[in-house]
Structure formats: C-alpha cells, structure tokens
Amino acid sequence: MKIDILSIFPDMFSGVTGNSIIKKAIENERVAVEVTDFREYAEGKHHIVDDYPYGGGAGMLLKAQPIFDAVQAVKEKQPETKPRVILMDPAGKRFNQKMAEEFAEEEHLVFICGHYEGYDERIREHLVTDEVSIGDYILTGGEIGAMIVMDSVIRLLPGVLGNKDSAVTDSFSTGLLEHPHYTRPADFRGMKVPDILLSGNHAWIEEWRDKESLKRTYERRPDLLKNYPLTDKQKTWLKEWSDSK
C-alpha cells in the first residue's frame, strides 16, 4: 500500500512513521508513507495556501489550487492506481473499524489535512472521494486525525502484526468490545485471574471470552448490539443480565 499525506506541517508525522508498528511496516515494505507539504504547490511568490471567504465571515479558507495540484502530483507518481482521496474534516463520516477495513483493501490512500476555518467547497465537490471525521470535536488541524486513521489501517495490512489473529480479535473487529485479558502472575496482591482461564479447557475459555465480550459491550456500548446478529445463547445471557437489574 502507498499512503500520501498532504499537510502544511509535514514534520508532525515523523514521530508516527519513525516508531513502533508503523516504522516496522515501512521497513518491511508492507506500506510506503510519503508526506508532502502542499504549500510547495501554491502559486505565487509567497506560496499562500489560504484566503478570505467570499461573502465574509470569520477565519480563512484553504484555497483549492494548491490542494488540487498536490493531489494531481501524487497521483502521477502512482499512475497505475486509483487512490481514495480522504479529506479529514469534522463534518465527514464518523470513522470506525469497518471503514478501516475498507481502506485497508485499497492500494493507494491520499489524506488531505486541513487547517484554518475550512476548505474551499470545490475541494469537497470535485476532488475527494471520502470525508472522514474522528469524532464530534474540533482539532487545530487534520494531522492528528490522519495519524489515527493511518495507524488503524496499517495494522490491518497482511504481515504487519506479529500475530495474524490480533487484528481479527480486537474490539470492534468482531462487532463487540473485546473480552478482558490477564497475564502472569495468577494472583497479584490478592487480585486473582478467573479460575476458568487457568483450567486448560479451551472450549470453556472460548465461551467465557464470548460471554465477557458480550457483557462488556452490553454494559459500555449497548448501541453496538442494535444490529448485531446474536446467537440464541447470547440472547439468553442478555436476558439474564437485563432481568437482574
């Protein structure tokens, strides 16, 4: 996969691409990440990327020209692919695991990171394929949001995680929150690991994990259960918990 990031603050990404799993993914050629300062594509002596909005109003808007030209430039470097051009914006579609899995199937992603009051609307209408938000709050720019999406996508690429099952069993990947985890020692200051996890009976352990995953989702994110395909056993567990309230 190739990931291009367009930002007027490219140095912000050095910490993300130079550490941990993303660094290893780049070194192992599972993904290539290139950060471009789209200010370099702005016309004029001073390379200005923003301007006042027509009709007045507070703040400045990112101009269409530098972003259009920057996207065109990164496309020309990968002419054999048709990239998803992703605009990081609080008005976009809420990012989730399903979207991460969809993006992970692509060959080329281009992230546009904004600043100031917003974007010239022609960028939305004629350039991007996706508008993505990481939540109902405002950040200084789109860089942190792009980092979050990029991290979520890269870890799903084949060969990136040491254990291929890790991404499959994570919270949200199954539609439910993940079950509790424990490691050694079995007794830490009187706080004990559930006996069933020490039993060695894999069938019991899997059922316990399934039940605890459902219970955690029921208690913390019941909205996730609205369209979840529950088994008969899971329906029985939910009824027990509901009746005990």
Swiss-Prot record:
Record: residues binding S-adenosyl-L-methionine: G114, I134, G135, D136, Y137, I138, L139
GO molecular function list: tRNA (guanine(37)-N1)-methyltransferase activity
EC number(s) on file: 2.1.1.228
Disulfide bonds: none
Keywords for this protein: Cytoplasm, Methyltransferase, S-adenosyl-L-methionine, Transferase, tRNA processing
Catalytic activity reported: guanosine(37) in tRNA + S-adenosyl-L-methionine = N(1)-methylguanosine(37) in tRNA + S-adenosyl-L-homocysteine + H(+)
GO biological process, one term: tRNA N1-guanine methylation
GO cellular component terms given for this protein: cytosol
Pfam families assigned: tRNA_m1G_MT
Intracellular or extracellular location(s): Cytoplasm
Quaternary structure, from the entry: Homodimer.
Role summary: Specifically methylates guanosine-37 in various tRNAs.
HAMAP family xrefs: TrmD
Name of this chain's protein: tRNA (guanine-N(1)-)-methyltransferase
Organism encoding this protein: Listeria monocytogenes serovar 1/2a (strain ATCC BAA-679 / EGD-e)
Gene name per UniProt: trmD
